[in-house]
Amino acid sequence: MPFAFRISLFIWPLALACSLSASAADHARIGDYGFDATGMDLSVRPGDDYNAYANGVWAKRTRIPGDHAYWGVWSVLDEQAQGHVRDILTNASKAQAPAGTNVRKLGDFYATFMDEAAIEGRGATPLKEQLASIARIDSYAQLATAMGGAIRIGDSMPVTTFVYPDFKRPDLYTVYLDQGGLGLPDRDYYLSDSAPMAAARAAYLAYAAKLLQLSGVAPSEGDSVARAKRVFDLEHRLAEIQWSQVRQRDLPARYVPWTRADYPAKAPGFAWDAYFKAAGLGDQPILIASVDSAISATAAIVPTVPLPVWKDYLAIRAVDGHAPFLSKAFVDAHFAFHATALAGTPDLEARWKRGSRFAEKAMGEAIGEIYVRQYFGPESKAAATQLVRNLLAAAGQRIDGLDWMSTATKIKAREKLDAFQVKIGYPDKWRDYSKLAVVPGDAYENALAADRFEYERNLAKVGRPVDRTEWGMTPMEINAYYDATKNEIVFPAAVLQPPFFDPHADLAVNYGGIGAIIGHEISHGFDDQGRLFDAHGALADWWTAADAEKYKQRTTALIAQYSAYEVLPGLKLNGELTLGENIGDNAGIVIAHDAYHTALGGRAPPVIDGQSGEQRFFLGFAQNWRTVWRDPILRQIVTTDPHSPDAIRVRTVRNFDSWYAAYDVKPGDALYLAPSERIRIW
């Protein structure tokens, strides 16, 4: 997604649930869907390490499967969801549905990818036409044309584009220009002098050389290594001028409208007309420069790099972008770099899993339409809708009770909250795939066609009214998000089913788990980025100056608190990068706790497995985030991801008074904070 203001939960699990009844029949439900008493380490004091207390035994006995970079509750549910998708695709491939139907396209796409022998037999042949086109480039204008064409098939370029609602006119779609084109995950991988980053750079150099040789672009190993080094040096120059992850969170700075004439004037050195024409943007009068200084600096770099280096760069990006659809040599090279070197994953996923994911990326809503009929019942949707309403009501009461916010800002905040659009389960209108051509027997072309289709689908939106029925996730995704330009919260079907959500579950675990997630997404409308957008989704300042300053004081303290956390030896969390998500975690748990007590209606909750209602609420929250990681992916997440790692997210509880009361946490406990040091924003 282009901006952090469509703020997702990422991929982390929601809650396991447990039964409110203590009957013998319900004890099985507690075991299946409740907090995991067997995974707790009762030798650890909750106040010293709440994550270890809630999840310690589970973490010690859990082994990460070879084809995963991490493993947690989400991983288990993802496996289940992928199994459902596999069944849908397998049935589609056997259905012999009429040509042109979604079922036929899904079946052909999946069956073609699964025909490994046919793909192996073609070797590097599918690349031939694209690489020949790159080889013919003999001017910088043709280079710009090639870059504009490359983004249409999903290749990452130094200047890329995307379509999104206009910040100032969120009822209309517009075009944004952004930075990109790096082979490593982030600029810091090029610029950091740490040993792990140096190792990642060495792995990338070897991978780039391998792609040049496998594709036939470089005639020998020695030649490929030298040419890959020149491409790496080019990317290093790009990394130096690109915006950092933290700087990219400054959304007002990312809204800089430039006219077509502004681009050659403010970013000389690049053939903008050729680029825009090739990208299908020749008639667009205004395009938002979302990283203006980086765009100008990139344009200045272009003519200083020899064309042969640029051509090798384009070839590497082309091969890397679609290597999973080529023969085994390409697949293995791609996996060894992206999954093993960068994420620590030792084993390649089964082919059916890869095929399911690629089909979901290409035709996600076509799969989703079948998925919700089979796996998402009306009872779950109705119960989830009511739960969201309860959390919205609790959020409103929380705003009303803030002692640091003025009445004027509270009124505007309530207006925004009342205007929230809530989407549950699946879209009301399914995506039209009639223009997507799927060719039986050509996996590589199908991948390109899917990317072209998605690009053209978005390009057709430019200048048109925003479709507020559109979803940014498929129903099968175990995730959720808030979109500031639409002022909406979205919860796909897969997160609203057991064991994530059970309409009959214990209130404590349901609210501590999925309730905190819903509260988290609601709060994104008022985090350090979301608060910059009004009830209509427009970038507008609706805060009093005094309230904005009080808010900044609190968020500055939160940055300092999280920046002190060490994730790996010598690797601290970036509290500025993770600020919005940390606000969401801290707000989500207090909103959910308020809603939980409202839902109790004055009733005393039962004690289950020795845990009070308050304790089960916090266990629902903590066990939600239990995950074990391989170090390389954890390092990548700390460098690039606005979410704190899961063990850090569990520490949210130390800012919440009720957690101290639930476990009698006292001075001297490792997580103890004096009341004056507990950060309270919402």
Q: How should these model regions be labeled?
A:
Residues 8-19:
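Bacterial N-terminal signal peptides
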Residues 20-24:
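Sec/Tat signal peptide C-region and signal peptidase I cleavage site
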Residues 26, 78, 237, 266-269, ...:
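Intrinsically disordered, low-complexity linker/terminal regions across diverse proteins
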Residues 26-38:
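Short, Gly/Pro- and small/polar-rich lid/capping loops
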Residues 40-60, 190, 194-213, 579, ...:
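Hydrophobic/aromatic-rich, well-ordered segments within soluble, folded domains that form packed cores
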